[in-house]
Amino acid sequence: MFEKIEELERRYQELEALLADPAVLGNQPEFRKLSREHSDLSALVESYRNYKKVLVEITGNRELLADPEMKEMAEAELEALEEQQAALEAEIKLLLLPKDPNDNKSVILEIRAGTGGDEAALFAGDLFRMYGRYAESNRWRVEVISASESEKGGFKEIVASVEGDGVFAKLKYESGTHRVQRVPETEAQGRIHTSACTVAIMPEAEDVDIDINPADLKIDVYRSSGAGGQHVNTTDSAVRITHLPTGTVVACQEERSQIKNRAKAMKVLKTRILDTIMQEQSARLAADRKQQVGSGDRSERIRTYNFPQGRMTDHRIGLTLYRLDAIMAGDIGEITDSLRVYYQMEALKQQSEAA
């Protein structure tokens, strides 16, 4: 393990020299590429350097054990240093796990109302606002691509892009069925109703990820319409694109410009097709190892939001928090961080079992 880290530390030093080279500074694409690599290695190199410092201190304290006057102090320090050593070793093992190549990507977020009718649509709107506020706190940009509004408020379906650094890394475990338990405003008897929404988080496809043959596309244009079905535009600006080989259909009418709607629809189409490929690969891997870890299975019920109790429970990791108001206001960092740590530990366990 440490030979590999020494090699990576040497590469880190090379990158520092390259990033200071005027020739690299003048080549922005190359500079950005090397900067990303430097950034990816920085946490590992810092932890490894701290680890080496702790080893030196441990050696020094062990030598002091032979001195009767220093023995008691050396033993106390040695215990603390050995705890640091163990913690840094665990941290380094996590940092050495293979990186998900999609982690730095922006995402397409899709929320669909499921069982529960109007109440499910209202909850879809609540979830969209929750993710929107979380995105805002991370300085990400959210742009609605398509939305089907419910007559009572909320959304039957909403599709949006969330753009920024590391969006997929933080949101990828949000895919699945989100269940809500609360008393609807129209419920005279005060009975708690249960409804659900499905969330899909897909890494945004880039041109290098997927190549689509234009001959495989059927493109329709039509007039955009509002929530009640009335036409809100006098020109054929709305666009529907069908990918014939897979039957994937994407429509977009949010923009007044047909060109912009077409570009947005193509972005979602590519992302959905890439996501289908990734899901198939994930299923094959799961079959090979007889279990599916952190796959984001869309049919899986992952979370319950219980409004009467002010409680949120994530069923995958058994995490329960009694601060639902803050969570619905976008304070979901503790949830996303806990999920990332859990699945990292699962991956580490699998790596150890395979070794």
UniProtKB/Swiss-Prot annotation:
This is Peptide chain release factor 1. The keyword Cell membrane does not apply. Methylated by PrmC. Methylation increases the termination efficiency of RF1. It is found in: Cytoplasm. Belongs to the prokaryotic/mitochondrial release factor family. It comes from Geotalea uraniireducens (strain Rf4). Coiled coil: none annotated. Peptide chain release factor 1 directs the termination of translation in response to the peptide chain termination codons UAG and UAA. The lineage of its organism: Bacteria, Pseudomonadati, Thermodesulfobacteriota, Desulfuromonadia, Geobacterales.
